[in-house]
Amino acid sequence: MKSDSIKKGPGKAAQRSLLKALGLTNEEISRPIIGIVSSQNEIIPGHMNLDKITEAVRKGVLMSGGTPLVVPTIGVCDGIAMGHEGMKYSLVTRELIADSIECMVKAHAFDALVLIPNCDKIVPGMVMAALRVNVPAVVISGGPMLAGKHKGKDISLTTMFEAVGSYENGTMDEKELCDLEECACPTCGSCSGMFTANSMNCLCEVLGIALPGNGTIPAVFSERIRLAKKAGMAVMDMLKNDIKPRDIINERSIMNALKADMALGCSTNSVLHITAIANEAKVNMNLDIINDLSSKTPDLCKLAPASNIHIENLYAAGGITAIMNELSKKDILDLNCITVTGKTQGENIKGVTVKDYEVIRPIDNPYSENGGIAILRGNLAPDGAVVKRAAVLPKMLVHEGPARVFNSEEEANTAIFDKTINPGDVIVIRYEGPKGGPGMREMLQATAAIAGMGLDDSVALITDGRFSGATRGASIGHVSPEAASGGMIGLLENGDIISIDINNAKLEVKLSDEEIKRRKLNFKPLEPKVKEGYLSRYAKLVSSASEGAILK
């Protein structure tokens, strides 16, 4: 056992004395030591219940003969951080989380890990750490929030952000806004649509690093507690059978995850995170593979924000295993990939069926023959840009209009709320990339305001920043290279004609080669927005969004 390095033999008497200071008996010390990494806190609704998940995992480990020891890690609530300086500190925590777990595992020689995240960056950060330390590991999340109810309709956090736009536009009064506020987020759990947190929790099932049910069992269901106990038991079986994260997450399982991503219509952030996870798994991932997979993978689900269907409905319809089984009917997935159950994906999904074809479309009658995410390229994004095609109105799949250029999210939001954006405009928000932000903020406040003001059928938005999974509309992010690195987005001027063709994966600015060359000669990037602290260090080390915004 790895933990023998801190407990075996006369030379480790001092270390054993410290373990006994924890209250551990000789019997407990002699067993495998299982690190339980919990991101429980009292600021994220999706993490407030993780103490209960942690206790259930502990029981599962104990039932199977291990000694569980709980260690913490940080987490940011993207919704609370949205629309202000705080959003600069969201994506950057992914690397902090991965690094801190690596430190704890290596320093204390844990034999195996159970990782307990729930929301946006915490999930990929923990998966990245699992691959890096490569000891047996299981991910068990806290589960999705139930949808809110208002006047007989299901609502979510997207409803709230868009309601702010409606209020600013004068189409909603303050009483209605406050009524929505009271019921949009009714329970603990990750926000109720196919936003980033739920996207990643669902994709953990497909990667094989989480048990079936991880992505969709609601946070408030007792079944979630039972699943957590099973996770604690499963990691002990993995330790016994020497199954490690790099045995599970490899090129084949990553391709499975990308295909499921297409079928589910996941958040565009999933592209960023899967790319970063692939890097930790030593898998070379080119963004162009996404369009290739999208052309072969139908879109089977339209979940919020693309519709009013939520994760609880996906759970009732059969969950991720049902979607995988549907995809398997056309041999889209590699079902021979091993998982944390010790079985293959094919064995895991055997006998599972779709219970509601209104939620999960049959493979022969999809919403679209193409997947939910597209990579765009062109002179405006030679290294790629990402759009959630499944959440774009059909009339906006092809759009051409004049650029309205802003050097920060705040500038753009002011223009939107001041009602100076016209139908047909293409809002450009730059210097919000991994380096330029720094931290690659999400533009949910801007996109939600556009939708709330009724402009989502005529206005597009492009940025070198990111979008929340709660964003809908012609919102194109991750434009690479970013402005701070001299990318074309930094050369744009008000009035430049932007051409968007999502059907043909194109993103262009209509300028002559001579004009582009002239602008490049005169280009001077803005001064760094942050010159001290963690963000300053991050900006110096972070890679392009096209590489997953990993640190190098």
Curated annotation (Swiss-Prot):
Task: List, in alphabetical order, the Gene Ontology terms for molecular function in this entry.
Answer: 2 iron, 2 sulfur cluster binding; dihydroxy-acid dehydratase activity; magnesium ion binding
Q: Which biological pathway?
A: Amino-acid biosynthesis; L-isoleucine biosynthesis; L-isoleucine from 2-oxobutanoate: step 3/4; Amino-acid biosynthesis; L-valine biosynthesis; L-valine from pyruvate: step 3/4
In the record, which positions carry N6-carboxylysine?
K121
Its UniProt entry gives the catalysed reaction(s) as: (2R)-2,3-dihydroxy-3-methylbutanoate = 3-methyl-2-oxobutanoate + H2O; (2R,3R)-2,3-dihydroxy-3-methylpentanoate = (S)-3-methyl-2-oxopentanoate + H2O
Q: Which residues bind [2Fe-2S] cluster?
A: C119, C191
Q: Which UniProt keywords apply?
A: 2Fe-2S, Amino-acid biosynthesis, Branched-chain amino acid biosynthesis, Iron, Iron-sulfur, Lyase, Magnesium, Metal-binding
Q: Which cofactor is recorded for it?
A: [2Fe-2S] cluster; Mg(2+)
Where does the source fall among the domains of life? Bacteria
A Pfam family in this protein?
A: ILV_EDD_C
GO BP field = isoleucine biosynthetic process; L-valine biosynthetic process
| Coiled-coil blocks | none
Positions annotated to bind Mg(2+)? D78, D120, K121, E442
**Binding partners and assembly:** Homodimer.
Q: What does the record give as the function of this protein?
A: Functions in the biosynthesis of branched-chain amino acids. Catalyzes the dehydration of (2R,3R)-2,3-dihydroxy-3-methylpentanoate (2,3-dihydroxy-3-methylvalerate) into 2-oxo-3-methylpentanoate (2-oxo-3-methylvalerate) and of (2R)-2,3-dihydroxy-3-methylbutanoate (2,3-dihydroxyisovalerate) into 2-oxo-3-methylbutanoate (2-oxoisovalerate), the penultimate precursor to L-isoleucine and L-valine, respectively.
- What protein name does the entry list? Dihydroxy-acid dehydratase
